[in-house]
Amino acid sequence: MTFDGNFMLGAATSAHQVEGNNVHSDYWVQENLEHSSFLEPSNIACDHYNRYEEDIRMLKSAGLNAYRFSIEWARIEPEKGEFDENEINHYRQVIDCCKEMGVEPIVTLLHFTSPAWLIKEGGWESEKVIEYFARYTSYVIEKLGDRLAYVCTINEANMGLQLAAIAKRYEMMAKAAQNMKEPPVESGKEAEGKVQVGMNFQKMMENMKYQAAENMQAFGTPQPQTFVSARTPEGDIIVMKAHQAAKKEIKKLYPDIRVGITLSLHDLQAVEGGEKYVRDTWDEEFVHYLPYIKDDDFLGVQNYTRTVYGANGQLNPKEDAKLTQMEYEIYPQALEHVIRQVNKDFKGDIIVTENGIAITDDEIRCKFIDDALQGVKNCIDDNIPVKGYCYWSLLDNFEWQKGYSMTFGLIAVDRDTMKREEKPSLRHLGSYI
């Protein structure tokens, strides 16, 4: 089984997770608080900021033809209204490097991290973010749009609602357990395994009493509204309006650029009695966004596992289920199921912008890729317009609050020397095109 040359087959990263020294971002501030929920700070990350050419060359030499990466808003606009020409030139060089090597750049304008100044202005619960994000988008596209064919405005726009639901449930259980002097019914690890991003719920709960004061000092508010904060329904709509405003700016400057958003989507399955949970959760994860994305050129589908519901709600994986380092069930068939479900309502193109596995055994990674890509091919054979697949991630990188403990990468990175080591899975993925 192979894909034709028009299919975009590649890997993905995000700026903060690989570049290093993203000192003007909200995450950098949070990582370096005394009572941080992060296992460790990002620091130099993978030094991709300086080594991008080496990394893109490794991607290309393995046979891959696409690279999804993000532009860091906090680098471009480190202070409100002040744009850094040197940083936009850096991203121009990254894009040109892709072009010279025959790799399609798929650019994301916001991948979780924001400038610290934005959070001080109210962050992602303030309507001001719509104007600010549109202005940033306009600047980037004016400078780089002539080199781009695909732009994702916002990564996993629905993540805030997913985190809100999980954090609320975990907080309630933790408080109940505290009152009863018993451990929570659901451990922090189990809660973390239900969301497609690296979170430390246990540590967040332990640090809560300290973090309010530290956040007040850092951001001017005890509860900073970063992009990856538990989001209100009103904040959810603000994110979608920011997407639409950014899309308008892109199309005004370069109408031919293909514009979309990416969503974190689980393969939702029901056992007896769980059907209503599945319907309600799919509505929250996907359906209610349709009015805001129905005219987009493509949707970025991001999937890692399935979620099973029974009569009393979400079920933990079976005892004999194989889990990843992230506590996800290893279930690569989920991707095909999600693509088919999305295609029922969304009529634009589909690009798998993230799909991967955090594990040390690379043979298991190769098998996961085999099964996931078979599902993609099945969808294409049924005339579903899947235009690309980007494995997460190109490099073993900074998995947010989990630090460097999660190994998603096709390429290993020595934490002391930054030396890259290609895993067999890199060329295994490249063999499909």
What are the language-model segments listed below?
Residues 1-56, 60-65, 70, 76-433:
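Non-catalytic scaffold segments within catalytic domains of secreted glycoside hydrolases
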